Regions:
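Aromatic/acidic polysaccharide-binding cleft in carbohydrate-active enzymes
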Residues: 20, 32-33, 251-256, 277, ...
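Hydrophobic faces of well-ordered beta-strands that scaffold small-molecule active sites
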Residues: 13-15, 73-75, 119-121, 207, ...
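N-terminal structural segment of carbohydrate-active enzymes
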Residues: 1-118, 128, 133-137, 174, ...
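Aromatic- and acidic-residue-enriched segments that line the glycan-binding/catalytic groove
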Residues: 6, 26-38, 84-96, 125-164, ...
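Active-site-adjacent "subsite" loops/lids of carbohydrate-active enzymes
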Residues: 129-202, 210-213
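Conserved, mostly hydrophobic/aromatic
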Residues: 17, 65, 75, 92, ...
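Active-site-proximal helices and loops of the catalytic beta/alpha 8
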Residues: 109-116, 127, 132-143, 194, ...
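The substrate-binding groove and active-site-proximal loops of carbohydrate-active enzymes
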Residues: 41-56, 88-102, 174-189, 205-215, ...
Length: 411
């Protein structure tokens, strides 16, 4: 079988945006809440607080994003939710009103496409939330609800909030706030497929899939790919899988995964013994122990042999994300480590992804600190920003940086 992946991804430089933290619109008339109790933009973020970033603010920031050389944006979830990260989905067809709703998203999509910037959304299809209408109906009506078989319920009554009693349903990572879908139910599968199709038809350029390894239903992701690609053959499907992903990268499911197998050894090599271990030891990737050059080369060659070359070229390579500490903090503030890591990222086969703010030296410990508000211009690190712009320009200038062979040379 000949593996086919979207050609545009091979030439993309992604920018990952956490929508609540990139920018508040400068046009208050477009905000749903004018007197909202937002957290101070520059204050340290909290687990539950909102800072009030919105899609209008991102539209206003597209010129800056384009000036970096970015031509694709991956958004963490934007759908209606009761959490600042929006992984607790209430409505898969409604962009969160706090972000500007569907109106703002349609305007953002059009504005991004006018600048030749692709848009990839985060699909949280393993689980929903306590506020998801179908689950809420189960809470209200118990065994009589028509949606009972949409979830993995083991007994009655359900206890969605009181931890003194058994939940009696499966929540992702044992979290009662995140009821897991019953993907073996054909109605659930069809519902998710139709969500994916709806937003692709609206014009998005792909899906990043949250914890897709949790969905065990045979053929689920194969059908997902078939139905998405039937609408847009160039749609990008990328999974959040932290380790060996050969199971999903056989050409019938995902075009790539978030390449933490690149991030770990790259940081271990560039930051070495400067890596702040408490920022990485509880994570699902390993930027430690320190690696010497020959050891790093061996790790990278092993990684490049793991998947077909067509897949390597559409991996989503990264150094940090909303699920990790930021590189500046992991490296103990060492700018040389940050710049060397960025050099390796932007010269590696696959699509590089820059986590918003990393290009200006934004620090941040593990969640929630890694989700700070985008810094004021006065606080930007101009040297790191210059490094990013130069390397992105070089990557765009030379095709070999994007699709050429990768060889290790020994001095």
């Amino acid at each position: 079988m000949q593996i086919q992946t979207p050609d545009w991804v091979k030439h993309a430089v992604f920018y990952q945006i956490f929508p609540d933290r990139f920018a508040r619109s400068k046009q208050p008339r477009k905000r749903l809440l004018h007197e909202a109790r937002w957290e101070d933009w520059e204050a340290m973020p909290t687990l539950q607080g909102y800072k009030g970033g919105d899609l209008w603010g991102i539209i206003e920031g597209l010129d800056y994003i384009q000036s970096l050389g970015i031509n694709a944006i991956y958004f963490t979830p934007i759908f209606q939710s009761a959490s600042n990260h929006r992984y607790h989905t209430h409505d898969y067809y409604q962009v969160d009103p706090l972000l500007g709703g569907n109106e703002a998203f349609k305007e953002l999509l059009e504005a991004a496409h006018q600048k030749n910037i692709k848009v990839v959304l985060d699909g949280v299809f393993n689980h929903s939330s306590r506020g998801f209408f179908f689950f809420h109906d189960v809470l209200e009506n118990g065994p009589q609800s028509p949606w009972v078989n949409w979830f993995k319920i083991h007994g009655w009554p359900l206890s969605p909030y009181n931890g003194e009693f058994p939940a009696n349903y499966e929540g992702w990572a044992d979290n009662r706030a995140l009821p897991v879908f019953n993907h073996d139910n054909p109605e659930v599968k069809e519902y998710i497929m139709e969500i994916a199709e709806y937003w692709i038809k609206l014009g998005i350029d792909g899906w990043r899939l949250d914890v897709p390894f949790e969905i065990k239903t045979p053929g689920f992701w194969q059908e997902f790919r078939d139905r998405v690609k039937a609408i847009n053959p160039d749609a990008y499907i990328v999974g959040e899988v932290w380790g060996d992903s050969r199971e999903w990268l056989d050409g019938t499911q995902f075009d790539g995964v978030m390449n933490y197998l690149f991030a770990g050894p790259t940081i271990a090599f560039t930051a070495g013994d400067r890596v702040v271990l408490e920022q990485v030891q509880s994570r699902d990737y390993q930027p430690y122990p320190p690696l010497f050059a020959a050891e790093y080369a061996a790790k990278i060659q092993e990684l490049l042999q793991l998947y077909p070359w067509e897949i390597q070229l559409t991996q989503l390579n990264l150094l940090a994300s909303h699920d990790t500490a930021r590189l500046m903090t992991i490296a103990g503030g060492d700018k040389a480590s940050v710049e060397l890591s960025t050099l390796l990222l932007l010269t590696f086969p696959g699509a590089p992804s820059i986590y918003y703010g990393d290009e200006v030296g934004l620090p941040g410990a593990i969640d929630p600190d890694s989700r700070r508000g985008f810094p004021l211009e006065a606080n930007w690190d101009r040297e790191i920003l210059k490094t990013h712009r130069q390397l992105i320009e070089i990557r765009h200038q030379y095709p070999a940086m994007r699709t050429g062979d990768y060889q290790v040379l020994y001095a």
